[in-house]
Amino acid sequence: MEKMYRILKILIVVLLAAVIIAAAVVLPRQAEEQPEVQTEAVPQTEAANENLAPNFRVYDMDGKEYKLSDFRGKPVVLNFWASWCGPCKAEMPDLEAAYQTYGDRVEFMMVNLTDGSSETVESASSFIAGEGYTFPVYYDTGMEAAVAYRIYAIPVTYFIDASGEVRATHEGMIPGEALESNIQALLAQ
């Protein structure tokens, strides 16, 4: 009986060795027989364009939704601001003057970072009304635009051409001359 167990053990070891050897021979051959995957260069599309301005949703004073893409076909001056921000307030007169001059040819999106605590729709709209500004103001109540543009400091202004590409960015308070030259560059395209 002991002899039979010994033969059985040897037989099991030989069978396991045969399975391992067979697997080592067959599996690499199967991998070699896999068809080669063909790849080709894909032409750059609008979606792959790194300069394409991220789309987002914001709301006007009446709660109507707007998207950046709604203004495709027209250059856009996109400005992120808040009423508690000193540099934001300091650049507003130049932005208003530019809006008065170019508002028929360039869309102005004055996006207020309305987080609901340090800035509310009420505080922002009260500031705008008190100063008599007439440019369009949009409220980023869900912070969607701020996230899309990775806004970590304000003010910041983006100059977006009619095809939706970001052509220039200015972080911090934008001087009137820089605002003017960037708008002129957008209109020249």
Report the location of each language-model feature:
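Active-site acidic short loop of glycosyltransferases
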Residues: R72-K74, D104, Y133-T134, I151
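Conserved redox-active cysteine motifs that mediate thiol-disulfide chemistry
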Residues: R72, F80-A97
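Thiol-/selenol-based redox modules, centered on thioredoxin-like
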Residues: K9, F159-Q189
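Conserved helix-turn-beta segment immediately C-terminal to the redox Cys motif
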Residues: K74-P75, M92-N112, A129, G176, ...
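Thiol-based oxidoreductase modules, predominantly thioredoxin-like and allied folds used
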Residues: V106-E119, T134-G142
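N-terminal targeting signals for export/organelle localization
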Residues: M1-A53, Q189
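A short beta-strand-turn-helix
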Residues: E50, N55-V76, Q100
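Short, internal strand/loop/helix patches
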Residues: S125-S163
